[in-house]
Each structure stands twice: as C-alpha cells, then as structure tokens.
Amino acid sequence: LVALALSQTAYSQITNGTTGNPIICLGHHAVENGTSVKTLTDNHVEVVSAKELVETKHTDELCPSPLKLVDGQDCDLINGALGSPGCDRLQDTTWDVFIERPTAVDTCYPFDVPDYQSLRSILASSGSLEFIAEQFTWNGVKVDGSSSACLRGGRNSFFSRLNWLTKATNGNYGPINVTKENTGSYVRLYLWGVHHPSSDNEQTDLYKVATGRVTVSTRSDQISIVPNIGSRPRVRNQSGRISIYWTLVNPGDSIIFNSIGNLIAPRGHYKISKSTKSTVLKSDKRIGSCTSPCLTDKGSIQSDKPFQNVSRIAIGNCPKYVKQGSLMLATGMRNIPGKQAKGLFGAIAGFIENGWQGLIDGWYGFRHQNAEGTGTAADLKSTQAAIDQINGKLNRLIEKTNEKYHQIEKEFEQVEGRIQDLEKYVEDTKIDLWSYNAELLVALENQHTIDVTDSEMNKLFERVRRQLRENAEDQGNGCFEIFHQCDNNCIESIRNGTYDHNIYRDEAINNRIKINPVTLTMGYKDIILWISFSMSCFVFVALILGFVLWACQNGNIRCQICI
C-alpha cells in the first residue's frame, strides 16, 4: 500500500505539471447558459450567443409616418370614390395607405360592383381620389335623380360622382349617344352604373321603355348591360339595385355611352397614376403618432429583423412573414461550459476539455502559469477574424430577406369562391415554401458559424504549436508544457506570434534530458499497481482463511463434509 501511494504521488506530480515548468493553455469563451440553435445535423446545438431573426412583437396602433395614412372611418374606398353621403371629406385626398374600417357602411342607394376587387385595387394603387369634373350633354333625359335612401343634409340625394338619368318631362328617354375623348397624358377612370328597378311599373315610370340597355365602348373594349327587373330584399327601404361598372381610357382613346334607359352616368373621371405604390389596408387599429415603416392589420412593426410572425398582411418596408415563431441565428461559437476542479489553476484546462467563462473580452485566448504567477489574455486577432465572418454573414442574410415586402389582403365575391380558394392555396403554398427556405437558410448559416469558430480555434492552436516546436510538449488538452524559463514577456511573444524558438532551444533540450529519464522510468507504476493489488488480495484472502480456522478451533464454526 505504501508503494502504491508513492507511485501515485510521483505520477500525479508529472501529469499535473508540478515540475515547475511554465504552462500555457489555449481556450475559448463560454457562458453558464448558452442558446440553443438548429443546424443541418442537429436540432439543438448550444452556442455562446445567438440573434433572434423573427419579430413577434408589434405596437397596437398604426403609425402615420413615414407612410401617409388616410382613415376611411365610416366609408370604404369604393363609397369614397362614388361620393356617398358622409364620404365627402375623402374627395381629392392622397395616401400611401388607405385605412378601411370593418365598421364602414353604405349610406346611399344599395349597389354592387361586379368586379369589386379590381376597382378597389386600381383606386388604392393610384394613391388619390383626384376627381376631374367634366361637362356632359345628356339630351332627351332628366338629370340629377335622387333617392330617399341617400340622404344628404336631411334631403334626398345621390352619389356625388354619378348622375342618375331618368325620362324627360315630356315622358321620353333619349336615346343617349355621348362621346368623350381622353386628350390628357394620363389614364382616366370612369365610374358609371346600370339601375335595376324592382318592378315593371318602376321601369316605365323612370325610363318609359319596358326594357332598357346600356352600352359603353372604347377602342379596345365594349360592355353592354340589360337591366334585371325584379323585387329584391329591401335595403334602406329600396328593393331596386344599382350595378357599378368602371372603364379605363388611355390617352388618345375615347369612351362612348349609348343608352335607351337605366344609365347611371359619370360626372367626370379619376386621374390614375401608375407610378405610385399605394395600397389599402383593412384594420380596426387606431392611428397613433408613432413612426414605423411597416404596417399590418394588427398594428405597426418596428424591427430590423428579416422575418416576422405578426401578420400575413404587411405593407411597407416589412420583414417577410414566416410561420415559425423563432429562428435563432448563431453569432457565437459552440458553448462548452467550464468544468470545475480540474486542470490549470485548479479549475480549467485547455479548449479540448471545456470553455472559459471568464474570457469576456474575446472569443479565444490564453492562460498561463510561470514563475511570475498566472494570467489570462484574449487573442483579438482570431476573435476578430471570426466576428468579421459572422457579421458579414448576418448582414448578407438581412440584406437578402429584408427587402420591401408588400402583401395585401384578397377579397372576392361569393360567386368567385373557387378563385378565392385557389388564391388562398397559392398564398399558403408561398408562405410554406418561404418558411421552409428561411429555416434551411438559417440552419446552413448556423452550421457554417460553428465550423468557422471551431476552425479559428484550431488555427490558433496550430500557430502556437508551430512556434514552440520542440521547446514544449502538447499535453493533449489544449495546453503546452514549456521546457525553459518563460517570463511574462516570453508568454506575450507566444501570444502575439513573435516567439523565436531558437533563443530557448538549448535550454529546452537540457531540461528535457533531465525530465525525460524520470518520466521514462515511470513505467514501473503499472507494475507496482498490479503487484500491490495482487498482494492486497492475497493478504485479504489469508485473513479470511485464518479467521475461519480460528473459529473452527474454538467451536464457533462447525464444518460438515457429506459424501
């Protein structure tokens, strides 16, 4: 047992570096609790630091800057364009985003728009309700018809941008044949309509003819509508309806109105600009006094992250919508928390075994022990090399994904339900595809980050090993035992790459000669261990046998052998 203890003590002195030689260890930064990220091969890799790429927070209001907002309040965009009562304040307004409220209501004669979404999109993208009034000559009819369903100031009225034509005082109606040429330099939008009476009597009372017809033509298009006469559920005490149509007239083209009854005529046109990127947003959020480049139906997003999980409907300079609530991009190396009571300084060994939680001013660094004491220093060069690669990658990732993203809501009439289903399928597929691509892209970047940081650690280790050469011995755990006196200046030269092994070569060789014989003879340790173990077992067995014989002689144990 004494021999075993002596051999173990001698071996511990050699392996723990208590020979008095200087030791320098290479290490990397670590934290007590790292962040888990996904890579191509592992769903949970702990790293020192990571950046969240998905924005999940938003303000509960719409910011009117830098995007100019127009609040429709009780009026939607179509009613504003038609000039419904209560919507007059919207005339000639301009916007980047027109805010439609879910509480908006129709306030005039009940109407429908067969191509509602297209008209809404054209008006929204034009960015204004700039109306140009025109003089029309409607011969043989009575103009400025009104309805009790369309009260303005307590009196019967009508859509301010439309002219309801009925039979003249002599009882006749037209016929109408009016032409307007677009002599301007912009596209004109004409709104017009067809009245569908609730009965044959109403038809003849208003238009004399039993069956009316409206035809509107341009060089490239023509539409002809015959009214559908019949009773419908009453809306604002009216069972008749008006269908609203629209026509775009390019510069140099003309629009022709032909009718023998039931025409709801225009009073002018809207100036359409194709150079703007304005839009419409339906939301119940109030307009605040904040600033945000990104609006959603749920509020504003103020973030520099490349992705968001707030809403599919996003307008402005917005992060892309993804289905994932979190995508963590590694911005630091693999985290290996430090082990306790082991290695240099009684606590920490080199990078192969664990990281250093105390290395706060760099990712990679050195710790040493010599005659002057102990010390720690970061290696800024390798740290900066890794940071540059990671930051460059982060900037490229944000640049790729944080482009202007514009997704507006889609609306369809019930008769277009199949189109709505198809549109929803396409949008869902696009989101699924982009969400998958985003997750794959982040996993690729995380894999590369970890590989880069591991590579920089290995580069630093190889640089030190090539400097020291035969003047030191690799202990296999990220540390080197130096076989010559190495003060703090010497340690610093190893760290900064100016170490000259030739200066210390002779001293290191002499010290190796003194140490190696002792080290080589330590091979007897295994022999002593086995001999000690065998002798201990022999003594233990002999003691047991002696006790049994003594007990048998005193009658305490009786042995019977049966054959």
From Swiss-Prot:
Chain ranges on the Extracellular side, renumbered to this chain: 1-526
UniProtKB keywords: Clathrin- and caveolin-independent endocytosis of virus by host, Clathrin-mediated endocytosis of virus by host, Disulfide bond, Fusion of virus membrane with host endosomal membrane, Fusion of virus membrane with host membrane, Glycoprotein, Hemagglutinin, Host cell membrane, Host membrane, Host-virus interaction, Lipoprotein, Membrane, Palmitate, Transmembrane, Transmembrane helix, Viral attachment to host cell, Viral envelope protein, Viral penetration into host cytoplasm, Virion, Virus endocytosis by host, Virus entry into host cell
GO terms, molecular function: host cell surface receptor binding
KW Ribonucleoprotein (keyword) present: no
Residues on Cytoplasmic side: 548-563
Post-translational modification: Palmitoylated. In natural infection, inactive HA is matured into HA1 and HA2 outside the cell by one or more trypsin-like, arginine-specific endoprotease secreted by the bronchial epithelial cells. One identified protease that may be involved in this process is secreted in lungs by club cells.
Keyword Secreted: no
InterPro entries: Capsid_hemagglutn (IPR008980), Hemagglutn_HA1_a/b_dom_sf (IPR013828), Hemagglutn_influenz_A (IPR000149), Hemagglutn_influenz_A/B (IPR001364)
Subcellular location: Virion membrane; Host apical cell membrane
Further information: Major glycoprotein, comprises over 80% of the envelope proteins present in virus particle.
Family: Belongs to the influenza viruses hemagglutinin family.
Subunit organization: Homotrimer of disulfide-linked HA1-HA2.
Purpose: Binds to sialic acid-containing receptors on the cell surface, bringing about the attachment of the virus particle to the cell. This attachment induces virion internalization either through clathrin-dependent endocytosis or through clathrin- and caveolin-independent pathway. Plays a major role in the determination of host range restriction and virulence. Class I viral fusion protein. Responsible for penetration of the virus into the cell cytoplasm by mediating the fusion of the membrane of the endocytosed virus particle with the endosomal membrane.
Protein name as annotated: Hemagglutinin
